[in-house]
Amino acid sequence: MLSQLRGKIIVAVLIGLAVVVVLGLFSDLRQVGASFQQFNWAMIPAILGFTLLNYGLRWLKWDYYLRKLDMGHGVSRGASGLLFTSGMVMAVTPGKVGEVLKSYLLRTMNGTPVAASAPIVLAERLTDGLAMLLLMGLGLTLYPPARPLFALLVVASAAGIVILQFRPLCERILAQIGRMPFGGKIAPPLTTIYESTRHLLWWRLLVVATAISVVSWFGECIAMYYVLRGLGIAPSWYLLLVATFVFAASTLFGLVSFLPGGLGVSEATSTGMLVVLVPMALGPATAATLIIRFCTLWFGVTLGAGALAILSRRYQLDQRPPEEQSLPANEAADPKIA
């Protein structure tokens, strides 16, 4: 497994390096270098601390989903933490969909079918997106051009949740798929995926998970604030609002771009908005973007690689592919929600 992932991670790292080079060429390299030299590196512990707060709370959300769907049998809290952290190595995949790796690892640990647990990753991404929309909404008055896309994402998210909760329509679609050629093979796992997804988007779970996401991602918004403070920007509530809006918007735009890790889109959005809203010169804005990306995205990828290496040794993932095991039907297709 690790041998297959290494190539993908290396490609993502190369893309990330290319983004750094392009940003450097687009900006004044001397200004960027000067900004790094002037940066107050004593801010790094606070920046990484708030990033770790985000990771910790998101792990709680992952574990909350796991226990609510009765899929955590045989998985200790520590193992759950390693499992969650290992998924962060796939944060550089398009839309973070590669984090379904957690489902394969969970199958190895306790036999939970991938089709049953994969919707947890979908629910994580959806609630993260909703949290980003809420955080971004706090600063919409700062940047009116972002309003149309914000409205579109709100409508699309609401429509998707409503459609998934409308069971007759979804069951009709699944029945049609089952009657198609080869549909008999994919309809059962799709039904399992739908049942898990529908329960995960039940309003009480949705509200709790979204609330956790808002608090967790606000931690990284505060990390962005400390990056700007490290570059010498005077502290103020306005600066915190700008940091929250810029980080949330750039992360969200990167997510919906479906580029690996949002690479390129997130960086360009963040740099451009910092220039307009702080305001600050292009060189320092580029430095701020690079620092926050290394302290969030790439920090998480590094932690994920370490956690995955531990799990690989523990479960010998390189020696054998995980075998598919089945749960009892009532656990796979009828997860509990209370």
Regions found by a protein language model. Give the residues of each.
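Transmembrane alpha-helix interface/packing and boundary motifs in multi-pass membrane proteins
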Residues: 50, 86-95, 246-267
